[in-house]
UniProtKB/Swiss-Prot annotation:
Signal peptide: none annotated. Residues 116-257 are annotated as: I-domain. It comes from the Archaea. Residues 1-98 are annotated as: N-domain. This is Flap endonuclease 1. Keywords: DNA damage, DNA repair, DNA replication, Endonuclease, Exonuclease, Hydrolase, Magnesium, Metal-binding, Nuclease. The keyword 4Fe-4S does not apply. Its EC number is 3.1.-.-. InterPro entries: 5-3_exonuclease_C_sf, Flap_endonuc, Flap_endonuc_arc, HhH2, PIN-like_dom_sf, XPG-I_dom, XPG/Rad2, XPG_CS. CDD domains: H3TH_FEN1-Arc (cd09903), PIN_FEN1 (cd09867). Belongs to the XPG/RAD2 endonuclease family. FEN1 subfamily. The gene is fen.
Amino acid sequence: MGTDIGDLLQKRKIELSDLSNRVVAVDAFNTLHQFLSIIRQRDGSPLVNSRGKVTSHLSGLLYRTASLVEAGIKPVFIFDGKPPDLKSETLSRRKEVRETSLEKWENAKAEGDLEAAYKYAQASSRVDQEIVEDSKYLLGIMGIPWIQAPCEGEAQAAHMVLKKDADYVASQDYDSFLFGAPKVVRNMAVTGKRKLPGKNVYVDVELEVIELEETLRALEINRDQLIDIAICVGTDYNKGLEKVGPKTALKLIKKHGDIHAVLREKDMEIEGLDRIRKLFTHPEVTEDYEIKWTKPDSEKLIKFLCEENDFSTDRVEKAAERLKAASGARQKTLDQWF
């Protein structure tokens, strides 16, 4: 997902407390995908209610968001709109991967291979419209704002940070920098120990921040050149050049100046290059949004999560209390200004 330029970026470890009282524009689809991939049972089966409806995303949204606001963080979730036409090939490939993974998951379960089953189950995750609508509803009754982007959610989130309506973008993908995001937080949705896919190895997943200007200075390039590097490697809108990884792409762009010169040197072309560039430099965004946190509605949370989706009443009530306490602390901070 996104572009593979992570090895070039300057990453810095931070704590949740470092984001206290900061507005974080969260890439909603990216975050929901993480919840759907990770919150699963041993055989890879997602959490479901008594009717068989998937609820892993609701669990992740409720409990992780409660932890974030409890830490003083002010999240606003940004949902993707209609994808650009140039993304259709990538979306088709992802669909094929999901369908293949789903078949392999069923086979692995039948064979009793739980490790393989879990791996393939993660790759079969899909954020559908019902999941999106349920997530928006849950955020609303939690008192957490969400915004519908006209196109790419990461582009909208980056725009909001550039406008100073938010302080950070939160996403696992690196596309945010191509859209101009000054600061991006990674691993905000899930931290702690994670098992590497296909390996009996666990790694610590820690919160980290990447700053665009710091990276550009270290690489001695500008943002347009970073976009060109990403296009060389491959983005959601193009496959990239054969056998060109991020480090090779960096050398090529620094040597030749831009991607047009690289393509001339290699006697190659990338179809729709200028359109691809424009999707990053002039993305479709909206100014029609409001960021407002409100008190959670405990009654609606109980009805939606416990009565309709079989969540533990005790756990939901505790999460609601955490959200209420954070909302009260936020209001107290605001009152100090007036």
